[in-house]
C-alpha cells in the first residue's frame, strides 16, 4: 500500500456512489483487506436504501476475481492504484484520481480515461503521507468533478431497459468498481 497521499477521500467516493445509485447504478468497492475501514466509511455515509446497491468487496476477492468483476463493470473510478491500471488494461472507462503522484509518470494505458488532478504548488510530491497534512491535492478534487469526468466517458443516466443485469449497470472503483488501494 502506498499511503493515504494517493487515496481520494472516502466521503467523496460516498457522494459519487450516492449520486450513481440514485441513477440506477450498483457500486462495487474493491481493494485489499487494508481498505476495509475506508469501505466501511463509504457505506456509513450512504443512506440505508443506497447501501442495498453498494457492495463492499474489499479483502473478499482474489486478484483474478477482481479482474473478472472489473471486466464487466460499466466504468471505474479509482485512485492511482494497481487495480486502476488493471481496469485500464481491460479497456474499461476509467476516472483516475492523482494526488501525490503524477500521470506523467504512471498513466493508465487506455484512451478511455479521464485523469483528474489539481495544480497546486506542493503537487506532485510523491510522498506516501501528505507532508503538509492537508491532502488538498485530493480533497479539492470534488465529487462533482469526478461525475463530470465520468459523464464524458459513459452515459451515467439511469438505464431505461427492464431486466438489465447488475454487471451492465455497475460502476467500478479500488475503492470501485470503486477502487481504494
Kindly give the residue locations of the regions a language model identified:
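Short acidic, gly/pro-rich beta-turn/loop elements at beta-sheet edges
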Residues: 6, 39, 135
